[in-house]
Curated annotation (Swiss-Prot):
The protein, known as: Putative B3 domain-containing protein Os06g0632500
Residues in the DNA-binding region annotation: 27-123, 141-238, 316-393
GO molecular function terms noted in the UniProt entry: DNA binding
Subcellular location: Nucleus
GO cellular component: nucleus
Key words of the record: DNA-binding, Nucleus, Repeat, Transcription, Transcription regulation
Primary localization: nucleus
Amino acid sequence: MPLSAGSLRRRPKFAAPLLSPACLHRLSVPGEFAARLDDDDAAGVGEEEEEESGRRAAAVLVVGPLGKVWRVELRRSPAGDGEAWLGGGWSELAAAHGLGEGWGVVLRLERRGVASLRVFDPGFCLARFCTPHAGMRTKDRPRFIKLLQQEDLEKMKIPEKFVQQHLTETYTNNHQNAIIVCPLGKFWRVELQREQPDVLLRDGWAPFLAAHDLSEGNILLFRYEGNMVFTVEVFLQNGCLKEYKTAALYLTDGTEGPSNAPQQSAAKVGVSPVKRKRTRRIEGTCLEGPNRKSRASPISVKVEPHKKHVSIVSQNSFTKEMTAYSIHSLLSVRGTFCSQIGLLEACAITLKISMKKKGSWRVAFKTANTYGYINGPGWRKFCLENELEVQRR
């Protein structure tokens, strides 16, 4: 199911999945990340100290997992070799959060001179420094970080602690599928396999790595959305977030990767009158969303000529009979379908009639307890301009 997406603007990030003892006192960061983090207007250390050390230093602010702001020195080598590191103040921050050898950190640039910090424990899971009260929703969804090793290229073990905390109730079969949504814009179905006591990403995993040019040394950051849906961020071997400027999104039904056959790969919503004098097929339903606060992905739609169709409808599709309420108020979408394609929270969605045409309609997608729905002026405009009528399917 092709998904149309524009530029993916993500905040720069740096990942260090396995800290050494030296990293607890001085954390090396890539020069490109340091260049974006460095605030030229921020107050640095004294000029005399700079001259004595032979290195330029700037003060940056690091927001810890509990919200406390730490002042840390960012030092860069004057030799222009790209060497940079977090120095003064970093060791105090690390000690305050109990960081040790084998822990991991991810820094995200919030703006010039300011970065936020996430910490991962030796079990590779997002560290929780406080337990939310019962009934309270935490901002951070469960995450785990993975530095790819040679043995992970054919099958990858999900951290045991993560399985125990988040997957035990959901993962009930020895063979069950997970959906991985990656920054490249593809939805991949990968088989989960139980090999006591481990849970492995197996069938479909190697094609996923190959399609995204991932190998030993790459870093993956998984975020669990629920219902066996994971989003993943990809980092280069130097720890910098891999940036994708364009995306063509697909929903794969097997381990062979995206299918080239539109009849099998595209989700279809049939729209036709009761007497079936005319049929319109809306294909390629896909999801595009903004960055963090509404992390979703675009819905692209393709209308085929008015002729009879004999095709295989993908599992990830649905058919709706249009009513006056669905046209003028809202169109409901099954909760299982939303979960299946990664629509998990309110976002803006782009509807397209054809991937080859420029026309598109921006509509609002929202969630209720057991279903999702599309509504608002954008949806009504889409119905009007595409002549959707009552009792069409």
